[in-house]
């Protein structure tokens, strides 16, 4: 897709009388695997917010060769696995924890960003001032260091201790959990990912096809489709939604305001985290907004309290927070 913007001849200018110097701007979708070639051949003039490590390195090589330049800056956002907390296995916190333990997020972040990013413990960017203020406290949060044993313990503590027929788990195959209605739920997670996505490709090898996922008694099924379809399922909070797992990224505004994303019953609450846990997280997010203007210390404390509770509930699994690069 592409959108064409043309200079408005009726615009009087800003307060200094300045008007646009460029007559036409075309904003177009550029596939990740061809974006650098398009920049090199002049098919595009600017690549904005490049995040993939391989593409960044290719762009930096082009800059070193001459004729191109770049800007880099810390991202006020992060990439994540978003999970539905109202249906399927991911409605149970122990499953969300187990998934985090089964993904080597340090290696994932290093591989995807090419060293231009790092792992975070919640929904924030490493260069946001609150994260810098509370760096030591953030280091004390659960980092979900890769561990099959920790994943298995979470699942056992969560009641995933049965075979399909209700007998004690045999130690191989899919685990099951006995629900309140007497039925047994298989530990099978349905994942919808967008096509031509390098993060999805990396998640296939590092999580979905990771032998330790099978060893833990878990299975993740991947369905690939368009990004438009992904958003349809991502915003569907009904219990009939066939998918519980999505990978995408999110940016944060200034000021940092995420309360609307966790309001119970809201369509913006895409994790569908409800009940006492959801209300608590929402109240903590609201506390930031209710801080007296100018009281940075109180705001940062409220921010950390929200992050700490989020880190335990884990409605999403943080993958990376990275530096953006613009090439031109």
Model-identified regions with their sequence ranges:
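Ligand-site clamp/hinge motif
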Residues: 10-58
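Extracytoplasmic/peripheral linker and loop segments enriched in polar/acidic and small residues
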Residues: 97, 144, 217-231, 256-328
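Short helices/loops that flank or line small-molecule/ion binding pockets
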Residues: 33-45, 51, 61, 93-94, ...
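A structural signal for short loop-to-beta-strand junctions that line the ligand-binding cleft
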Residues: 66-76, 120-123, 317
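Append "and occasionally in soluble cytosolic enzymes with long acidic Gly/Pro-rich linkers
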Residues: 91-209, 305
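Second-shell loop/turn segments in exported
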Residues: 24-26, 82-88, 95-98, 134-144, ...
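Short, well-ordered beta-strand elements
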Residues: 3-4, 22-28, 185-195, 220-222, ...
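Ligand-binding "clamshell"
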Residues: 56-72, 241-242, 255-271
């Amino acid at each position: 897709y592409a959108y064409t913007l043309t200079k408005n001849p009726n615009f009087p200018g800003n307060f200094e009388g300045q008007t646009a110097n460029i007559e036409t701007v075309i904003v177009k979708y550029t596939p990740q695997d061809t974006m650098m070639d398009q920049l090199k051949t002049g098919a595009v003039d600017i690549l904005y917010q490049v995040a993939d490590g391989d593409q960044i390195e290719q762009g930096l090589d082009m800059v070193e060769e001459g004729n191109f330049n770049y800007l880099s800056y810390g991202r006020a956002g992060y990439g994540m696995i978003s999970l539905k907390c109202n249906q399927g296995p991911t409605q149970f916190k122990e499953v969300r924890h187990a998934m985090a333990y089964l993904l080597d997020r340090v290696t994932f972040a290093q591989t995807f960003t090419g060293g231009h990013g790092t792992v975070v413990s919640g929904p924030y960017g490493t260069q946001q001032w609150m994260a810098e203020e509370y760096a030591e406290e953030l280091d004390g949060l659960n980092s979900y260091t890769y561990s099959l044993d920790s994943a298995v313990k979470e699942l056992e503590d969560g009641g995933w201790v049965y075979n399909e027929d209700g007998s004690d788990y045999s130690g191989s195959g899919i685990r099951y959990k006995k629900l309140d209605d007497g039925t047994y739920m298989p530990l099978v997670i349905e994942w919808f990912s967008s096509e031509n996505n390098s993060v999805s490709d990396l998640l296939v090898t590092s999580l979905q096809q990771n032998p330790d996922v099978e060893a833990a008694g878990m299975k993740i099924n991947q369905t690939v489709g368009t990004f438009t379809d992904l958003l349809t399922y991502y915003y569907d909070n009904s219990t009939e939604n066939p998918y519980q797992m999505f990978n995408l990224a999110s940016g944060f505004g200034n000021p940092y305001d995420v309360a609307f994303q966790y309001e119970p019953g809201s369509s913006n609450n895409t994790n569908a985290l409800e009940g006492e846990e959801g209300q608590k997280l929402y109240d903590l997010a609201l506390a930031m907004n209710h801080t007296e203007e100018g009281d940075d210390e109180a705001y940062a404390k409220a921010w950390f309290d929200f992050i700490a509770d989020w880190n335990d509930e884990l409605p999403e699994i943080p993958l990376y927070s990275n530096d953006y690069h613009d090439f031109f």
